[in-house]
UniProtKB/Swiss-Prot annotation:
<comment type="function">
    <text>NDH-1 shuttles electrons from NADH, via FMN and iron-sulfur (Fe-S) centers, to quinones in the respiratory chain. The immediate electron acceptor for the enzyme in this species is believed to be ubiquinone. Couples the redox reaction to proton translocation (for every two electrons transferred, four hydrogen ions are translocated across the cytoplasmic membrane), and thus conserves the redox energy in a proton gradient.</text>
</comment>
<keyword id="KW-0997">Cell inner membrane</keyword>
<dbReference type="GO" id="GO:0051539">
    <property type="term" value="F:4 iron, 4 sulfur cluster binding"/>
</dbReference>
<dbReference type="GO" id="GO:0005506">
    <property type="term" value="F:iron ion binding"/>
</dbReference>
<dbReference type="GO" id="GO:0050136">
    <property type="term" value="F:NADH:ubiquinone reductase (non-electrogenic) activity"/>
</dbReference>
<keyword id="KW-0411">Iron-sulfur</keyword>
<dbReference type="InterPro" id="IPR006138">
    <property type="entry name" value="NADH_UQ_OxRdtase_20Kd_su"/>
</dbReference>
<keyword id="KW-0874">Quinone</keyword>
<dbReference type="GO" id="GO:0015990">
    <property type="term" value="P:electron transport coupled proton transport"/>
</dbReference>
<dbReference type="GO" id="GO:0045271">
    <property type="term" value="C:respiratory chain complex I"/>
</dbReference>
<dbReference type="InterPro" id="IPR006137">
    <property type="entry name" value="NADH_UbQ_OxRdtase-like_20kDa"/>
</dbReference>
<keyword id="KW-0479">Metal-binding</keyword>
<keyword id="KW-1003">Cell membrane</keyword>
<protein>
    <recommendedName>
        <fullName>NADH-quinone oxidoreductase subunit B</fullName>
        <ecNumber>7.1.1.-</ecNumber>
    </recommendedName>
</protein>
<feature type="binding site">
    <location>
        <position position="69"/>
    </location>
    <ligand>
        <name>[4Fe-4S] cluster</name>
    </ligand>
</feature>
<dbReference type="GO" id="GO:0048038">
    <property type="term" value="F:quinone binding"/>
</dbReference>
<dbReference type="Pfam" id="PF01058">
    <property type="entry name" value="Oxidored_q6"/>
</dbReference>
């Protein structure tokens, strides 16, 4: 389990970054190397990882946190017509220490960024972040000094949900993409002090994956049919 400690007198990073973002690099699946080294233990560890990831992705507890109008659409996904309980994410937590993932839903102002960082640091590993809405993704229409131009400037984001605001169905699709990403993760099965060495698969962009289907559409529905 990894804790992020932030000192009050912490010196700024050489590159000007205010948050210790994770370092990413391309690598092969560690399970494949283990299988060639020892077939039995490699397969056993692969099964254990898959089982643990299956339990994690079907019991994601969200943190009750919102910033703007996108939060209204997020809470709508918890109502009966959408039934987010189908995905095991109906248990909303009021404390970040009991939550598994945080949804940044709405406009993130500069004064709010340190608060979001502190709440994120209070979450225990493993933890994930969903950026919901245009304002959280890139600042939206607020290209001004007081709005952070994307929460990925100071937080590691796992899934981006576009829209202004996104519909509840878009949030549910983002939740499913997060589940797919968690299933492919490789994390230590025991307690680890220091770098956890998390392996995450490269997820394809949905914009590129659905490009041919979008181009094939020739007749658009009217607003009252959407």
């Amino acid at each position: 389990m990894q804790y992020t400690l932030t000192r009050a007198d912490q010196e700024p990073a050489p590159d000007g970054a205010s948050y210790p973002l994770g370092r990413r690099e391309s690598t092969s699946d560690p399970m494949q190397e283990q299988v060639h080294r020892n077939v039995f233990t490699g397969k056993l560890e692969d099964v254990l990882n898959s089982t643990v990831n299956w339990g994690r992705k079907h019991s994601l507890w969200p943190y009750n946190f919102g910033l703007s109008c996108c939060y209204v659409e997020m809470t709508t996904a918890f109502t009966a017509p959408h039934d987010v309980a189908r995905f095991g994410s109906e248990v909303i937590r009021a404390s970040p220490r009991q939550a598994d993932f945080m949804v940044i839903a709405g406009t993130c102002f500069i004064k709010m960024a340190p608060v979001i960082q502190q709440l994120y640091d209070q979450m225990l590993e493993p933890k994930w972040v969903i950026s919901m809405g245009s304002c959280a993704n890139s600042g939206g229409m607020y290209d001004i000094y007081s709005v952070v131009q994307g929460v990925d400037k100071f937080l590691p984001v796992d899934v981006y949900v576009p829209g202004c605001p996104p519909r509840p169905e878009a949030f549910l699709q983002g939740l499913q993409l997060l589940q797919d990403s968690i299933q492919e993760e490789r994390r230590p099965l025991s307690w680890v002090v220091g770098d956890q060495g998390v392996y995450r698969a490269d997820m394809p962009s949905q914009r590129e994956a659905n490009r041919d289907r979008r181009i094939a559409v020739t007749e658009l529905r009217s607003p009252d049919e959407v």
